[in-house]
Design a protein with these regions (language model features):
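Glycine-rich phosphate-binding loop signature in dinucleotide/nucleotide-binding domains
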Residues: 45-48, 135-142
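Loop-to-helix element that buttresses phosphate recognition and phosphoryl-transfer chemistry
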Residues: 5-63, 67, 115-129
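Short active-site segment of divalent metal-dependent hydrolases/proteases
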Residues: 13, 152-153
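Phosphate-coordination/substrate-recognition cap region in phosphate-metabolizing enzymes
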Residues: 38-103, 166
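Acidic, His/Gly-rich catalytic cores of divalent-metal-dependent hydrolytic chemistry
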Residues: 191-208
Length: 208
C-alpha cells in the first residue's frame, strides 16, 4: 500500500488580507478563514486518515481540528511557517522599503538568504526534507494529513521535485489541498497541487 500525504494550508487570517508577513507569529483565523476551514473539513470528511499532524500555530491547528472532527491531532513545530525574524508582523511594503538589499537576495531564491534574526532559506528547506523523510520511514503505508502553511507546503514541493531555488513556485492558497504519494522506498510523487474546488464562492489570498 502506498504512503499518501495530504497537505492542507490553514484558513485565511487578517494578515493574509492586509499583506502583513506572519511567519511564525501566532495569528488567528478570521471569520472567512473559519468558514474556509469548515468547507475543507466537509470536503475531506470521508477520507480515512490514519494520522493527523498540524503546525502548532493556532491558524493551522484550528483548521486541523475542524477537519479532524474529534479525531486526535498531533501538533508539531516542524510544520511551522518560515521564521522571518524581524520581518514578522511587518507589511510587505514596509519590508520592501526598509530592507531593499535583503529583498534582492530573497527574490533571487538563494539558499543563503536569511531574514534578520530569522531562519535561512537553506535551513527551512532542510526542515521540510527531514519531515518528508520522517513520514516515509515512520509511517510507510499510512494515509497522512498535515495542516501547515503556504511557505512550508511549497518547500515540500521543492523536496518532491528536487528543486533548490525558493522563488517561482506556484501559489498555495488558503485551505488548498496538495497531495503526494510514495510506494515503499520509492520517491514521492506529486498527485495534485492547490486544489481549492471547495472554495468556489470565496475571494483568494496568498500571503505568508
Amino acid at each position: 500500500m502506498p504512503t499518501t500525504v495530504c497537505f492542507v494550508r490553514h484558513g485565511e487570517t487578517d494578515a493574509n488580507v492586509t499583506d502583513r508577513l506572519q511567519g511564525q507569529s501566532d495569528t488567528p483565523l478570521n471569520a472567512q478563514g473559519l468558514a474556509q476551514a469548515e468547507l475543507v473539513a466537509a470536503r475531506l470528511k470521508d477520507e480515512p486518515f490514519d494520522i493527523i499532524f498540524s503546525s502548532d500555530l493556532s491558524r493551522a491547528l484550528v483548521t486541523a481540528e475542524k477537519i479532524a472532527a474529534g479525531r486526535p491531532v498531533i501538533p508539531v513545530k516542524e510544520l511551522r511557517e518560515w521564521h522571518f525574524g524581524r520581518w514578522q508582523g511587518m507589511l510587505w511594503k514596509e519590508i520592501l522599503c526598509d530592507y531593499s538589499e535583503e529583498i534582492l537576495l530573497f527574490k533571487s531564491g538563494s539558499p543563503d538568504f536569511e531574514p534578520p534574526e530569522g531562519e535561512s532559506a537553506g535551513r527551512f528547506l532542510e526542515r521540510a526534507e527531514k519531515f518528508m523523510d520522517m513520514l516515509k520511514s515512520e509511517y510507510a503505508g499510512k494515509r497522512i494529513l498535515c495542516v501547515s502553511h503556504g511557505g512550508f507546503i511549497k518547500q515540500t514541493l521543492k523536496v518532491v521535485l528536487g528543486l533548490r531555488s525558493f522563488r517561482r513556485l506556484p501559489a498555495c492558497e488558503n485551505t488548498a489541498i496538495c497531495r503526494y504519494a510514495a510506494k515503499e522506498e520509492d520517491f514521492w510523487q506529486l498527485v495534485c497541487w492547490n486544489d481549492t474546488s471547495h472554495l468556489k464562492s470565496f475571494n483568494r489570498s496568498t500571503g505568508w
